[in-house]
């Protein structure tokens, strides 16, 4: 498998991880990915990129079965309001496409927040930097690598 930017950065940092490829034609929603990996939805995290009315961008890493609370996200970011980044703006800003956006190795370094629920887990999955690739790693390593802040940023369970 060709290494993604996320994998190259993990290798360079000496971070232990496992990569898992899956058939993206079976679906790319977070719950589809969890099912394909035969993992609990609380172990698989999605990477969401937001934008403020001032044009600032922030990354939020949340469990796939949960919904980002935009009010909590804005408060964490020190902004009045945050909205989800338009899909067409994702690739130019991050270097990643929708469904393959990794919190690791973005083109532009963005302030990152991870839901606090990740921190009591031995491992979590995040996108490996392309559709059909997930990376399993310690949340502590992810926080260190992305300089993320762990904080409660989710609403409630939305999918099972």
Predicted region positions:
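Extended, low-hydrophobicity, polar/charged segments
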Residues: 1-160
